[in-house]
């Protein structure tokens, strides 16, 4: 019982820090828009945008968890994120492109890792062969 009570303040504190981070980011974005478009935002508007954004992120998190759970997984995958973005075509296209880029980079990284052990094993085989040749020469000399 005491553990649950101890966790609640931590969770509340964590939630408040996340909200503050979202509010700060929204404020920075609003300042950027103000500079580029000469549109001013009141503090109340920034707070409202921050609150809506935070709530939407909570909904996204719950949906992603449900998609993964429905697929009998405990980990959210990029397919879950694509499913979440299915109603926003431009976002879905962007996510798909980035996912493909990451997949290509991963393939290149795996190909390099495969080549590296082969090169290492060749060099170790060559050095062992040289050592054996050297040992054979020493034996024949004695």
From Swiss-Prot:
One example GO MF annotation: DNA binding
InterPro entries: CENP-S/Mhf1 (IPR029003), Histone-fold (IPR009072)
A family per Pfam: CENP-S
GO biological process, one term: resolution of meiotic recombination intermediates
Annotated keywords: Cell cycle, Cell division, Centromere, Chromosome, DNA damage, DNA repair, DNA-binding, Kinetochore, Mitosis, Nucleus
Cellular localization per UniProt: Nucleus; Chromosome, Centromere; Chromosome, Centromere, Kinetochore
Entry annotated with the keyword Ribonucleoprotein: no
Region called Disordered, residue ranges: 107-142
GO CC annotation terms, alphabetical: chromatin; FANCM-MHF complex; Fanconi anaemia nuclear complex; inner kinetochore; nucleus
Predominant subcellular localization, coarse grouping: nucleus
Biased composition (Basic and acidic residues): 116-128
SUPFAM superfamilies: Histone-fold (SSF47113)
Acidic residues bias (residue ranges): 129-142
Highest taxon in the source lineage: Eukaryota
Subunit structure: Heterodimer with CENPX, sometimes called MHF; this interaction stabilizes both partners. MHF heterodimers can assemble to form tetrameric structures. MHF also coassemble with CENPT-CENPW heterodimers at centromeres to form the tetrameric CENP-T-W-S-X complex. Forms a discrete complex with FANCM and CENPX, called FANCM-MHF; this interaction, probably mediated by direct binding between CENPS and FANCM, leads to synergistic activation of double-stranded DNA binding and strongly stimulates FANCM-mediated DNA remodeling.
Protein function: DNA-binding component of the Fanconi anemia (FA) core complex. Required for the normal activation of the FA pathway, leading to monoubiquitination of the FANCI-FANCD2 complex in response to DNA damage, cellular resistance to DNA cross-linking drugs, and prevention of chromosomal breakage. In complex with CENPX (MHF heterodimer), crucial cofactor for FANCM in both binding and ATP-dependent remodeling of DNA. Stabilizes FANCM. In complex with CENPX and FANCM (but not other FANC proteins), rapidly recruited to blocked forks and promotes gene conversion at blocked replication forks.
Family the entry assigns: Belongs to the TAF9 family. CENP-S/MHF1 subfamily.
UniProt name for this protein: Centromere protein S
Organism name: Mus musculus (Mouse)
The gene coding this protein: Cenps
């Amino acid at each position: 019982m005491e553990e649950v009570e101890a966790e609640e303040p931590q969770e509340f504190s964590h939630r408040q820090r996340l909200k503050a981070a979202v509010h700060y980011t929204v404020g920075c974005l609003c300042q950027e828009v103000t500079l580029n478009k000469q549109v001013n935002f009141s503090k109340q508007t920034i707070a409202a945008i921050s609150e809506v954004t935070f709530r939407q992120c909570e909904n996204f998190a719950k949906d992603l968890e449900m998609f993964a759970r429905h697929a009998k997984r405990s980990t959210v995958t990029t397919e879950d994120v694509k499913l979440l973005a299915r109603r926003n075509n431009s976002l879905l296209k962007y996510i798909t492109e980035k996912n493909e880029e990451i997949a290509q980079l991963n393939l290149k990284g795996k190909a390099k890792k495969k080549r590296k052990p082969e090169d290492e094993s060749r060099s170790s085989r060559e050095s062992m062969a040289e050592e054996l040749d050297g040992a054979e020469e020493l034996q024949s000399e004695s």
